[in-house]
């Protein structure tokens, strides 16, 4: 028997039936305050694009939504849509799953590249004085 996803005791189907105000009460305080202040313009545009993409997905078309809005909280109505989220350099594809509800979209892409240390340059340390030049 597979484990059923729940968020704060509510199943995914129950979450979809909740209004926005009822869902906001389930969120942690930081996310709740962010949504209660109102959505920014880019977040509103993203939500409208998500709704049209979800409607197209029901018709069998696969629409990908591109966005820079990393500070948007994932809502139950967004589940199932594929988005391309900008990480500062390129757009990374993310398919929104039910387990992502209540998190920020930006949590799912890394914005910085891990440092790969190479050979030390000249003057990098006192011992590099004795490294022969190329």
Could you say what each language-model-derived stretch is?
Residues 2-134:
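Compact, Lys/Arg-rich rRNA/RNP-binding cores from ribosome-related proteins
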């Amino acid at each position: 028997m597979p484990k059923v996803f729940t968020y704060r005791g509510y199943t995914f189907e129950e979450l979809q039936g909740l209004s926005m105000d009822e869902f906001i009460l389930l969120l942690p305080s930081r996310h709740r305050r962010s949504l209660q202040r109102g959505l920014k313009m880019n977040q509103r545009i993203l939500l409208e694009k998500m709704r049209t993409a979800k409607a197209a997905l029901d018709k069998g078309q696969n629409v990908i939504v591109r966005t820079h809005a990393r500070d948007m909280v994932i809502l139950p109505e967004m589940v199932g849509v594929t988005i391309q989220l900008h990480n500062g350099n390129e757009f990374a594809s993310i398919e929104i799953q039910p387990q992502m509800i209540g998190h920020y979209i930006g949590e799912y892409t890394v914005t910085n590249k891990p440092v790969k240390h190479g050979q030390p340059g000249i003057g990098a340390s006192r011992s590099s004085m004795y490294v022969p030049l190329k």
